[in-house]
Amino acid sequence: MKILIKNGHVIDPDTKLDQVADVLLEDDKIQEVKENIKEEADRVIDAKGCYVMPGLIDMHVHLRDPGLTHKEDVVTGSKAAARGGVTTLVAMPNTKPVIDNPERLSYVKNKATQCNLVNVLQAGAITQGMKGEELSDIEGMVRAGAPAISEDGKSVMNAQIYKEAMQIAARLNIPVLAHCEDIHMVNGGCMNEDTNSEKFGLPGICNAVEDTIVARDILIAKDTGCHLHLCHCSTKDSEVMLRLAKEDGISVSGEVCPHHFTLTSDDIVEGDTNYKMNPPLRTKEDRQALLEGLKNDVFDVISTDHAPHTMVEKGVSMKSAPFGIVGLETSVSLTITELVDKGWITPMQMAEKMSYNPAKILHLANKGSLKPGKDADVVVIDPKESYVIDVKDFVSKGKNTPFQGKKVNGKVKVTICGGRVVYEDK
């Protein structure tokens, strides 16, 4: 099967190609990238006016499978990923039961293989049952295909156990994906601690909840030599510490989510639990630091922290509702609208942060690139097409987004995974 993508603006961070060209895919590999390819193909896609990028890689997704499949499952999550231009995703292990052994990891892997839409990589939990007490079978899970370990949803508060996990990760050459949150300081907080939390009469979450664990994790990573990836950074000091750590030669990377670079606590509509996520929406000053950090490549990655819940679960008070919003189907549009169109990052940086850099961090040698011989994972995006975000269009089970009704630019037109068209905008 040959697919020829014609006349698109090809953006490849691997080769630094940034021009109008054609891309020829044959079976599951990229065959050729150059101007005016004449070869016959089974399918020709006219990408005039569109970006043609390596398939996006989302390092931070909650598929809720097994055990929480009323919120999402491997199939619906994969469909949402494909609609969002994501051809590879990392699923977090905070499921029910927790993915803390090779057998449970294989369950997700097998389900994703049967689904056969996008590449689903399952991260393994750092500790058994995510209780923070005993290490999981990290080596067994890595042998079974885990690209990384994480305790996402919480931090491992026992620093010695965490250090031992980092030592294993360093030996196995896998990253640790860190959710930085000192649970002892949260105190039932449900939004950022600022004048808005006071106004709403809600308990707040201060920046130090994140910052103290960012500092700890960076220092343990320095000591162990493991690669630390900071998930969903939200504070100005996380940007400072990440920058200083990189200057110090520590192997560390960081991600920002679209909701944190788009919104602040000033945007929260009182009582609307679609604005409740963890870490919370911070201040304008914090958001500004995230934008500067994205622009200056302090932050390597844009991920979604896609966290679906049912409307019933979210339809309670701000204090009682679960944290989290969906993001797979809106991340491209928000990145183009809020970052590319406003001059914070270039289209090339977008491709780096949403594909090339995640591939490097996760050691996915054949992903994140449009070089001939690499995997035929490609996304075609119309950066100029405007539309209004509407949860009725979502294929995810989760409709919990604060972006309902927002007018955005940038639409995924075609997603190709392994040389197969897995999504097409009709």
Show where each model-derived region lies.
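His/Asp/Glu-enriched, well-ordered alpha-helical/loop segment
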Residues: 199-227, 274, 295-296, 300-301, ...
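Alpha-helix-loop-beta-strand connector modules within alpha/beta enzyme cores
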Residues: 102-119, 167-178, 330, 334
